Swiss-Prot record:
The modification Phosphothreonine is found at residue 63. One of its GO terms (biological process) is cellular response to unfolded protein. GO terms for molecular function: protein homodimerization activity. Keywords: Chaperone, Cytoplasm, Methylation, Nucleus, Phosphoprotein, Stress response. It comes from Canis lupus familiaris (Dog). InterPro entries: A-crystallin/Hsp20_dom, Alpha-crystallin/sHSP_animal, HSP20-like_chaperone, HSPB8, HspB8_ACD. The modification Asymmetric dimethylarginine is found at residues 71, 78. GO terms for cellular component: cytoplasm; nucleus; protein folding chaperone complex. It holds the Pfam family HSP20. PANTHER family: HEAT SHOCK PROTEIN BETA-8 (PTHR46906:SF1). Residues 178-196 have a biased composition (Polar residues). Involved in the chaperone-assisted selective autophagy (CASA), a crucial process for protein quality control, particularly in mechanical strained cells and tissues such as muscle. Displays temperature-dependent chaperone activity. Belongs to the small heat shock protein (HSP20) family. This is Heat shock protein beta-8.
Length: 196
C-alpha cells in the first residue's frame, strides 16, 4: 500500500448503532415546557430515561414481531411469527385472552361459541327505526385458538365499557407415561434423619 492511501472499509460512522437511552450530548428542550398542563404521572418529564430504560431494555420473553416481516407460511416458520388469522400464543402460565369491542350491542344480542378450534363471536341487532331509515347491524368474528388452550375451558365476560373479554387457561404440558424427564428416586444425600 502506498503512502497516503487508506485501506477500503465498509465502516460508516452514520450507521453505527445508537443507544436511545444514553444521555444525549445536546440537551433536549422538547419536554421542558409544560404549556399549563399537569405533569405526567411520576414526573415523567424530568426522569424519562430512568422510567424508560428498565421497561424497554429488558429481554423480551417471546419473539419480536416487526411490521416488515412478510406474512405467510414460510415467514411463520422462519421468523416464529403466527400466520395471518391466528392469535399469538400465550406466554407459559398465563391465560389466553382476547378482547373484542362490542359496545354497540346488548348482552342478549351477542353469542360466543367454540367450533373446530375457533372461538366464534357474533352479534345481531334487530331492525330499528333510527334517523332517516331502518338500521340492522350484524357481525361475526372467528379467532383461532392456540394449541395450548382447551376449547371446553373458554369463557367470556362483558365489561361495562363494552369490551367482550374471552379467556381460557392453558393446558398444562404433559408427557406420556414412561417418557418422564424427572427422576423418581430420592437423592442419596437426603436431609432426612432416621430416628431411633
Amino acid at each position: 500500500m502506498a503512502d497516503g492511501q487508506m485501506p477500503f472499509s465498509c465502516h460508516y460512522p452514520s450507521r453505527l448503532r445508537r443507544d436511545p437511552f444514553r444521555d444525549s450530548p445536546l440537551p433536549s428542550r422538547l419536554l421542558d415546557d409544560d404549556f399549563g398542563m399537569d405533569p405526567f404521572p411520576d414526573d415523567l418529564t424530568s426522569s424519562w430515561r430512568n422510567w424508560a430504560l428498565p421497561r424497554f431494555s429488558t429481554g423480551w420473553p417471546g419473539t419480536l414481531r416487526s411490521g416488515m416481516v412478510p406474512r405467510g407460511p414460510t415467514a411463520a416458520a422462519r421468523f416464529g411469527v403466527p400466520a395471518e388469522g391466528r392469535s399469538p400464543p400465550p406466554f407459559p402460565g398465563e391465560p389466553w385472552k382476547v378482547c373484542v369491542n362490542v359496545h354497540s350491542f346488548k348482552p342478549e344480542e351477542l353469542m360466543v361459541k367454540t367450533k373446530d378450534g375457533y372461538v366464534e363471536v357474533s352479534g345481531k341487532h334487530e331492525e330499528k327505526q333510527q334517523e332517516g331509515g331502518i338500521v340492522s347491524k350484524n357481525f361475526t368474528k372467528k379467532i383461532q385458538l392456540p394449541a395450548e388452550v382447551d376449547p371446553v375451558t373458554v369463557f367470556a365476560s362483558l365489561s361495562p365499557e363494552g369490551l367482550l373479554i374471552i379467556e381460557a387457561p392453558q393446558v398444562p404440558p404433559y408427557s406420556p407415561f414412561g417418557e418422564s424427564n424427572f427422576n423418581n428416586e430420592l437423592p442419596q444425600d437426603s436431609q432426612e434423619v432416621t430416628c431411633t
